[in-house]
Amino acid sequence: MKILVVLTYYYPHWTGLTAYARRLSEGLARRGHQVTVLTAQYWKTLPAEEVHNGVRIVRLPTIMRLSRGVIMPGFPAAANRLIREHDVVQVHVPIFESPLVTALAKRYGKKVVITHHGDLVMPSRPFDQFVQFFVTGLMRRALSQSARITIHTRDYAECSPFLSQFSDKLVQILPPVEIPLPQPERVKAWRQELGLDGVNVVGFAGRFVEEKGFDYLLKAVPLVLEQLPNTRFVYAGEVNVVYEPFFERWRHLQERWKEQVLMLGLLNDQQQVANFYALCDVLALPSRTDCFPMVQVESMLCGTPTVATDIPGLRVPVKLTGMGRLVKPMDEQALAEGLVDVLRNRSQYLRPREDIARLFDLETTIDGYERLFQSLV
């Protein structure tokens, strides 16, 4: 098959969404399919076209950033050409151009599969709320014209008023999770380097944005320390998020607890990410809203249980595996109690890597998409 994949950001950009798209695209390419990715040239130093791990990447110049997206003047012409050349189209939303893609595909008799990565939930500022309203409208139009909509979990979809409008099109395919085995000797050395020998380590990872709820974790720090003074919190991720300066609102808490809260920055190397998970005794996911953060399953595969808020989508890995605790969302007291429980009773929450890998198998995910695409060609 010739498969066209459309999304705003692709390799070497790294978020959960781009990791999803890259793992799936490269997996399909390994099986002999011709996969082309149409995406933004968000850095001018990136080549306009290249082949990476068997996937052809076509990058379009951008003229400006708009909230979380970018404006690509050359998109209509490029999409028009590439859609005609391919058998089926996959669009990862949100992306401004999604209704244009579905309209062009309809013109040429090509089917579109839209992969939904969560309802768009923006901060309460007026401009952000306008973007949320506008982009959700674009998504609604695109989803109405699509052949199928892939979702991460039924749990999230059943609680989403937006997705309930398209229940007859929904197909659940668990996300493609892939993480190398941790390196015990390097993990041990890293712990020593960071001064973490003999202490409890609470990890948290991802973009420091409002939806991730890391402000509640910072509020929970003194509550955890009251019961377990020998605890440190270690963050891996990006705090300088261009479209949402949320960290600045809570920097004072990080600085207040700077001896207990270590900031590692963004980790781009997947082996280093695996070692980070193994460095931690528990991973905290205090999200306000989250469709399905793959970091949770990656952490479990590296032997680290999680404490996550009991919200649609996010709660699924803990419910399926038992490898962690669910706590009330937006409640630092509940979060602290969950973290203390897992730290004190960690052995009760451990599960064999093989059990986690059977539930979240990369090849099974690729199988699901391969069958879906073939059914539409």
Residue spans of the language-model regions?
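Short hydrophobic beta-strand element within catalytic cores of glycosyltransferases
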Residues: P305-A308
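Glycosyltransferase donor-sugar binding loop
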Residues: W43, V177, A205, R232-E248, ...
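Conserved acidic donor-binding segment of nucleotide-sugar-dependent glycosyltransferases
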Residues: L320-T321, R325-E332, D341-R346
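Donor nucleotide-sugar binding/catalytic pocket of nucleotide-sugar-dependent glycosyltransferases
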Residues: T36, Q132, T136-P184, L196-D197
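Nucleotide-activated donor-binding/catalytic signature segment of Leloir-type glycosyltransferases, i.e.
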Residues: F246-L267
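Aromatic "clamp/platform" in nucleotide-sugar-dependent glycosyltransferases that forms part
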Residues: P94, R288
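Short alpha-helical donor nucleotide-sugar binding micro-motif in glycosyltransferases
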Residues: I83, L143, N275-C280
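Conserved donor-binding/catalytic core segment of Leloir-type glycosyltransferases
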Residues: G195-K212, L218-V221, V234-A236
